[in-house]
Swiss-Prot record:
Protein name, entry field: Methionine import ATP-binding protein MetN
PROSITE patterns associated with the record: ABC_TRANSPORTER_1, ABC_TRANSPORTER_2, METN
UniProt xrefs under CDD domains: ABC_MetN_methionine_transporter
NCBIfam families in alphabetical order: ABC_MetN
Species, as recorded: Escherichia coli O6:H1 (strain CFT073 / ATCC 700928 / UPEC)
Length: 343
């Protein structure tokens, strides 16, 4: 549905040249929810704006539903953009128009008959859960409701693609979850292809099928969400994953934790489990095999891309030889082990 090939984007600011994107290629199959994650300034907003040519690439090809957008005339591009809806971090609603009027605007600009506008807007407001807000004004809506209006407006022309530019970053966690569930529901009901950009791995984990990691204008890793979570190939991907699978060391342990071993100390471990290792009784097995005892301090389990993930903080009690053997055995069984220090 979306195919970006060798996209490069260069900005000129006076005598300065800024390369925002460098030879980026990305394929989003029809019906998928695809996430692009990166830090601020990585190039993700420029990338998503190249899809509908709000930013025209310096080099490269942009195919949407089999149509090459970079070669179209302005009138042809305007027509093609009707198949590409877009929502933003800021909702950009017209304060002088009601909810109905905001959603109706793109249909009015397209000279859609009034009866069809009424039918379509009513249908969309019901879809986004705002069937009772036809006559409300944006000033009377919550942030989540405003974003729902923006989503309905983006769907007014019945697009095949929806672009989401940090669409939840201005919302609180509970509202973010509700908007993500709405996007997932729309994807499922309408078969809509969704490309979203974010700096939050929680967003990717919750709804995306695939994810690409962008850094300094380049895609450094891309795969299914489950594969990236299970086997991250780059330090940046690992960092994003750790930000969503995170356990804080309790304060009393932080006060006692030391970087180097000392007499009668035990190692504190951070264990990450993925796939089959999540449900396997691996800690019990280490106790039997290596004569070690594990004192679990805290643990958390979650899902990403349909795959279960777990994280645990534990003290491993035993001789140095036994604990080293137990750690090596856990690593052989696909558990990521990090020695945080000694207590």
């Amino acid at each position: 549905m979306i195919k970006l090939s060798n996209i490069t984007k260069v900005f000129h600011q006076g005598t300065r040249t800024i390369q925002a994107l460098n030879n980026v290629s990305l394929h989003v199959p029809a019906g998928q929810i695809y996430g692009v994650i990166g830090a601020s300034g990585a190039g993700k907003s420029t990338l998503i704006r190249c899809v509908n040519l709000l930013e025209r690439p310096t080099e490269g090809s942009v195919l949407v539903d089999g149509q090459e957008l970079t070669t179209l005339s302005e009138s042809e591009l305007t027509k093609a953009r009707r198949q590409i809806g877009m929502i933003f971090q800021h909702f950009n609603l017209l304060s002088s128009r009601t909810v109905f009027g905001n959603v109706a605007l793109p249909l009015e600009l397209d000279n859609t008959p009034k009866d069809e506008i009424k039918r379509r807007v009513t249908e969309l407001l019901s879809l986004v859960g705002l069937g009772d807000k036809h006559d409300s004004y944006p000033s009377n809506l919550s942030g989540g409701q405003k974003q729902r209006v923006a989503i309905a407006r983006a769907l007014a022309s019945n697009p095949k693609v929806l672009l989401c530019d940090e669409a939840t970053s201005a919302l609180d966690p509970a509202t973010t979850r509700s908007i993500l569930e709405l996007l997932k529901d729309i994807n499922r009901r309408l078969g809509l292809t969704i490309l979203l950009i974010t700096h939050e791995m929680d967003v990717v984990k919750r709804i995306c099928d695939c994810v690409a990691v962008i850094s300094n204008g380049e895609l450094i890793e891309q795969d299914t969400v489950s594969e990236v979570f299970s086997h991250p190939k780059t330090p940046l991907a690992q960092k994003f994953i750790q930000s969503t699978l995170h356990l804080d060391i309790p304060e009393d342990y932080q006060e006692r934790l030391q970087a180097e071993p000392f007499t009668d100390c035990v190692p504190m471990l951070r264990l990450e489990f993925t796939g089959q290792s999540v449900d396997a009784p691996l800690l019990s097995e280490t106790a039997r095999r290596f004569n070690v005892n594990n004192n679990i301090i805290s643990a958390q389990m979650d899902y990403a891309g349909g795959v279960k993930f777990g994280i645990m903080l534990t003290e491993m009690h035993g001789t140095q030889q036994d604990t080293q053997a137990a750690i090596a055995w856990l690593q052989e069984h696909h558990v990521k082990v990090e020695v945080l220090g000694y207590v």
